């Protein structure tokens, strides 16, 4: 049983913590939180041990939330830390992980240099085996890599061109925007997503463009892939349909808008209405000779959660990629095939 700490209990951290609890080979030893907000109160009510920075102890105790210790105490009780702190904060914690000789999993908001390897379970699990510091790439990059590495099973991917429509903020981020604008992110090519993909697939010819849209629900990707060989649509459909962590959305569902997909998640009784699978619109798949085009939705709050679980096992050399992904998928109810 691996003792896992989660440093940072926000959008990603609380989901990763819940996923750890569901794993047969992991124990959540506690979470680190900086402010006694509603997330901390709910974690306490659920019996999760809460650790805080030294300077925050009094604030938590005055709020009525018992403190199990400092963040350093939490790190010491663990075998490995999943760092889900805000962008850039993980790099500030790395010297502590080094000093205490603890493995750590970082998130895509950190620069690639913070870790020994950038990680996508479907693409490079084996390369990450035994790496002390692993960076799980961002939500958008995770979706790109899942799709690219899956299509690559049919024929070698030679070139990728993708346009990303990014959500402006997560649903709880009330101080972010835009509210009534489309914002290039940035107005240059490529966006940072291409470089992030290349941190995993080093020599891939990829260019990306991105725009921020006034929505909170999901991202959307529009992707054009050039393959080494001529392929048929049925082969692309087959590999997408048979790869876990990818689901197909058929037009017969009459649910193609991202808001409708959230409603589907509600009706399916998904935890927090999460859909960690890449949601590919099956009717968007276009294949001609060596060219593949498709569009898909990305639930930014949950897509990286299974990757974090697999990254833990890879870092600790617990099992093979196939076994880890199977256990993760089964424990979290992650699907393949059609969503409904």
Curated annotation (Swiss-Prot):
EC number: 1.2.1.59
InterPro entries: DapB_N, GlycerAld/Erythrose_P_DH, GlycerAld_3-P_DH_AS, GlycerAld_3-P_DH_cat, GlycerAld_3-P_DH_NAD(P)-bd, Glyceraldehyde-3-P_DH_2_arc, NAD(P)-bd_dom_sf
Gene3D superfamilies per UniProt: Dihydrodipicolinate Reductase, domain 2, NAD(P)-binding Rossmann-like Domain
GO CC annotations on file: cytoplasm
Class of the enzyme per the UniProt entry, highest EC level: oxidoreductase
Residue numbers binding D-glyceraldehyde 3-phosphate: 138-140, 193-194
Keyword field: Cytoplasm, Disulfide bond, Glycolysis, NAD, NADP, Oxidoreductase
Disulfide bonds: 123-149
Superkingdom, taxonomy of origin: Archaea
Molecular-function GO terms, alphabetical: 4-hydroxy-tetrahydrodipicolinate reductase; glyceraldehyde-3-phosphate dehydrogenase (NAD+) (phosphorylating) activity; glyceraldehyde-3-phosphate dehydrogenase (NADP+) (phosphorylating) activity; NAD binding; NADP binding
Involved pathway(s): Carbohydrate degradation; glycolysis; pyruvate from D-glyceraldehyde 3-phosphate: step 1/5
Subcellular location: Cytoplasm
A Pfam family assignment: DapB_N
Active site: 139
Gene Ontology process terms (BP): glycolytic process; lysine biosynthetic process via diaminopimelate
Catalysed conversion reaction: D-glyceraldehyde 3-phosphate + phosphate + NADP(+) = (2R)-3-phospho-glyceroyl phosphate + NADPH + H(+); D-glyceraldehyde 3-phosphate + phosphate + NAD(+) = (2R)-3-phospho-glyceroyl phosphate + NADH + H(+)
Task performed by this protein: Can use both NAD and NADP as cofactors, but exhibits a marked preference for NADP.
NCBIfam families per UniProt: GAPDH-II_archae, PRK04207.1
Subunit organization: Homotetramer.
Record's protein name: Glyceraldehyde-3-phosphate dehydrogenase
Source organism of this protein record: Saccharolobus solfataricus (strain ATCC 35092 / DSM 1617 / JCM 11322 / P2)
């Amino acid at each position: 049983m691996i003792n896992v700490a989660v440093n940072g209990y926000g959008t990603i951290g609380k989901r990763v913590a819940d996923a750890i609890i569901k794993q047969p080979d992991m124990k959540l030893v506690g979470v680190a939180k900086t402010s006694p907000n509603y997330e901390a109160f709910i974690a306490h009510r659920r019996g999760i041990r809460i650790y805080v920075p030294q300077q925050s102890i009094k604030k938590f105790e005055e709020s009525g939330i018992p403190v199990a210790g400092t963040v350093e105490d939490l790190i010491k009780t663990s075998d490995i830390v999943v760092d889900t702190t805000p962008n850039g904060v993980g790099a500030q914690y790395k010297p502590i992980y080094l000093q205490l000789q603890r493995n750590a999993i970082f998130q895509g908001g950190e620069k690639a240099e913070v870790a020994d390897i950038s990680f996508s379970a479907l693409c490079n699990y084996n390369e990450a085996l035994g790496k002390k510091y692993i960076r799980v790439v961002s939500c958008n990059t995770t979706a790109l890599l899942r799709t690219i590495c899956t299509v690559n099973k049919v024929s070698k991917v030679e070139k990728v061109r993708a346009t990303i429509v990014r959500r402006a903020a997560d649903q709880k981020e009330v101080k972010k925007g835009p509210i009534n604008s489309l914002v290039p992110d940035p107005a240059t090519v490529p966006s940072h997503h291409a470089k992030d993909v290349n941190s995993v697939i080093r020599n891939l010819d990829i260019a990306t463009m991105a725009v921020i849209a006034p929505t909170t629900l999901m991202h959307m990707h529009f992707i054009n892939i050039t393959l080494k060989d001529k392929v048929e649509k049925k082969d692309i459909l087959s590999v997408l349909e048979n790869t876990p962590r990818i689901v197909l959305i058929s037009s017969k569902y009459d649910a193609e808008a991202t808001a409708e997909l959230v409603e589907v998640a509600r009706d399916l009784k998904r935890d927090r209405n999460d859909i960690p699978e890449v949601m590919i619109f099956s009717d968007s798949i276009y294949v001609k000779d060596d060219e593949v085009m498709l569009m898909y939705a990305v639930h930014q709050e949950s897509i990286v959660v299974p990757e974090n679980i697999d990254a833990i096992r890879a870092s600790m050399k617990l099992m093979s990629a196939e076994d880890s992904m199977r256990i993760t998928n089964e424990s979290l109810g992650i699907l393949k095939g059609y969503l409904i």
